[in-house]
């Protein structure tokens, strides 16, 4: 049965693999695809509620919805424009925007230790690797061994911080897509961003990494050591066209030995 969700919630603001965002006045409705795990919806609402308490620059969440077989969240509508808008074909503007995002990311990572409400990134990555049926037993064992020896820290990590998840209204920033937020090594957060930018353009990812390391003072190798592990969680979870890149990042574990 088809449903007219635009009539229910308003015009479509954006659409991704897991959810569609609708405008409802000053609110936004994030409506997840049918079959999307119920636990993930409530986890995101829980994370958003805790971020609000810590004055993190993210939308406030108001309720969990269940409409015609699909879960959703009603939250504040992000103000301003997405930082990734109108960057295509303008490399100088792209780099200038990336500079701003790196400064913001480093600032957020230095907010202080995060409470126990946020899962530790090593635990999340361990669970994701263990559940990933696309990894052979040997690869899984190797990546879990690498993960075990990576640093334990307590910084705030968005784990999906890039052009598309930050809005700016000329005064304030708003950060969205908060399900992956963890506490842990800030270098791990940077590794996640590096992979996201690599999906767009490898040169862009390298520019990001150089800028991030220069701003944060974190050595390049500290970021790159997280790549094989994070890439291992993505194998089979991202579009097929990115598989060679994911394989390259996983195989970097051989070079690191």
Residue ranges of predicted features:
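Short beta-strand micro-motifs within the conserved protein kinase catalytic domain, predominantly
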Residues: 60-71
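An alpha-helical support segment within catalytic cores of ATP-dependent transferases
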Residues: 110-159, 169, 253, 257
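Internal "kinase-insert"/substrate-recognition segments embedded within catalytic cores
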Residues: 91-120
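Helix-rich C-terminal or lid/interface subdomains of diverse kinases
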Residues: 38, 192-257
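ATP-binding glycine-rich loop module of kinase domains
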Residues: 12-42
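The N-lobe alphaC helix and its flanking beta3-alphaC-beta4 segment of protein kinase-like domains
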Residues: 38-54
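Active-site acidic catalytic loop and adjacent metal/ATP-binding pocket
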Residues: 20-23, 144-188
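Conserved short submotifs of the Hanks-type protein kinase catalytic core
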Residues: 69-82
């Amino acid at each position: 049965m088809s449903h007219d969700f635009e009539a229910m919630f308003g015009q479509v603001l954006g659409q991704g693999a897991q959810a569609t965002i609708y405008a409802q006045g000053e609110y936004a409705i994030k409506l997840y695809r049918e079959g999307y795990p119920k636990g993930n919806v409530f986890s995101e609402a829980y994370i958003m509620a805790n971020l609000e308490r810590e004055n993190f620059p993210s939308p406030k969440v108001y309720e969990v919805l269940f409409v015609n077989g699909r879960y959703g969240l009603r939250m504040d509508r992000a103000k301003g424009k997405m930082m990734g808008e109108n960057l295509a074909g303008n490399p100088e503007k792209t780099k200038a925007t990336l500079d701003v995002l790196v400064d913001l990311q480093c600032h957020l990572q230095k907010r202080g230790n995060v409470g126990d409400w946020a899962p530790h990134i090593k635990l999340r990555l361990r669970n994701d690797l263990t559940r990933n049926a696309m990894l052979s037993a040997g690869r899984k064992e190797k990546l879990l061994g690498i993960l075990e020896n990576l640093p334990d820290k307590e910084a705030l990590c968005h784990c999906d911080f890039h052009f598309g998840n930050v809005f700016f209204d000329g005064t304030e920033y708003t950060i969205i897509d908060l399900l992956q937020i963890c506490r842990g090594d800030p270098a791990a957060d940077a590794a996640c961003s590096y992979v996201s930018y690599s999906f767009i353009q490898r040169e862009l990812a390298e520019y990001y990494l150089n800028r991030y390391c220069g701003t944060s003072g974190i050595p390049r190798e500290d970021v790159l050591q997280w790549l094989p592990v994070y890439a291992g969680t993505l194998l089979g979870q991202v579009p097929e066209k990115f598989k060679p890149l994911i394989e390259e990042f996983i195989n970097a574990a051989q070079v690191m030995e």
